[in-house]
Amino acid sequence: MMQLMLYASTLITSIILFKMNHPLAMGLMLLIQTIQISMLTGLMAKSFWFSYILFLIFLGGMLVLFIYVTSLASNEMFSLSMKLTTISLFIFSMILIINILLDKSSISFFIQNNEMQSIYNLNMFLQENSLNLQKLYNYPTNLMTILLMNYLLITLIAVVKITKLFYGPLRPMN
Amino acid sequence: MLMMFYWSLPCFLFLMGVFVFVSNRKHLLSMLLSLEYIVLNLFFLLYIYLNLMEYLSFLGMMFLTFSVCEGALGLSIMVSMIRTHGNDYFQSFNVL
């Protein structure tokens, strides 16, 4: 039931994102979607490590929005329409009602045994999918980690070289 | 019911991100944010796929690192364009 509610809310978030115009509102939707997807991936595996990393990375990407909005798009309004909210709540409740009508066992946890719990936690494919990262630093695949380090360093240098301009302010010019 | 959503949800979210990307937005940052949205949903799909493998989940880390690097490069291109041309309107790209 928890996962189904998360699925329905991700669908609603994607539909709301489709109607957004302002970058700040799109960033807010992206942040909500990141929280939902990290909760979903945490529920699929046995530990929340990956979802923690995902949330921190995308939250760091959101920090650029504030300087953007304060310097470039400071005079734009954004509004959430009432019709869109009504349609979203309607779709959300429709998905929940259809699920309850089709599958009555998904609303009650206490009648399930252990195998059914594992089905509803959606890690039924492998018994041992604890998503461990022990190949990250061992020999045949640590070369990919070294490649990642070099790529990050080259990206750092490239970003500094691209944004090294000594003319023009960071503000809109109409 | 849940298994019906299991693989089709990230594909649907990916398609929604692609629709947001190709719909004509005003700012360049909206395009970059929709690209981040596509990357997020592709990471979700990759995570579901790597649940089937046993020890390959470090590929998700690699995917996240590459996506972060490309996002940083896109933002640096946007900053450079703002400082040279004054705005980041997507409609004025054919003038550049």
UniProtKB/Swiss-Prot annotation, chain A:
It is found in: Mitochondrion membrane. It holds the Pfam family Oxidored_q3. Its main location: mitochondrion. Keywords: Electron transport, Membrane, Mitochondrion, NAD, Respiratory chain, Translocase, Transmembrane, Transmembrane helix, Transport, Ubiquinone. It is an enzyme of class 7 (translocase). GO terms for molecular function: NADH dehydrogenase (ubiquinone) activity. The keyword Phosphoprotein does not apply. GO terms for cellular component: mitochondrial membrane. It catalyses: a ubiquinone + NADH + 5 H(+)(in) = a ubiquinol + NAD(+) + 4 H(+)(out). Its EC number is 7.1.1.2. InterPro entries: ComplexI_Subunit6, NADH_UbQ/plastoQ_OxRdtase_su6. It is a multi-pass membrane protein. The chain crosses the membrane at residues 24-44, 48-68, 82-102, 143-163. Core subunit of the mitochondrial membrane respiratory chain NADH dehydrogenase (Complex I) that is believed to belong to the minimal assembly required for catalysis. Complex I functions in the transfer of electrons from NADH to the respiratory chain. The immediate electron acceptor for the enzyme is believed to be ubiquinone. Belongs to the complex I subunit 6 family. This is NADH-ubiquinone oxidoreductase chain 6. It comes from Ceratitis capitata (Mediterranean fruit fly).
From Swiss-Prot, chain B:
Its main location: mitochondrion. Its EC number is 7.1.1.2. It is a multi-pass membrane protein. Keywords: Electron transport, Membrane, Mitochondrion, NAD, Respiratory chain, Translocase, Transmembrane, Transmembrane helix, Transport, Ubiquinone. It catalyses: a ubiquinone + NADH + 5 H(+)(in) = a ubiquinol + NAD(+) + 4 H(+)(out). Signal peptide: none annotated. It is found in: Mitochondrion membrane. GO terms for biological process: ATP synthesis coupled electron transport. The chain crosses the membrane at residues 2-22, 28-48, 58-78. InterPro entries: NADH_UbQ_OxRdtase_chain4L/K, NUOK/Mnh_C1-like. GO terms for molecular function: NADH dehydrogenase (ubiquinone) activity. It comes from the Eukaryota. One of its GO terms (cellular component) is NADH dehydrogenase complex. Belongs to the complex I subunit 4L family. Core subunit of the mitochondrial membrane respiratory chain NADH dehydrogenase (Complex I) that is believed to belong to the minimal assembly required for catalysis. Complex I functions in the transfer of electrons from NADH to the respiratory chain. The immediate electron acceptor for the enzyme is believed to be ubiquinone. PANTHER family: NADH-UBIQUINONE OXIDOREDUCTASE CHAIN 4L, NADH-UBIQUINONE OXIDOREDUCTASE SUBUNIT ND4L. This is NADH-ubiquinone oxidoreductase chain 4L. It comes from Ceratitis capitata. The gene is ND4L.
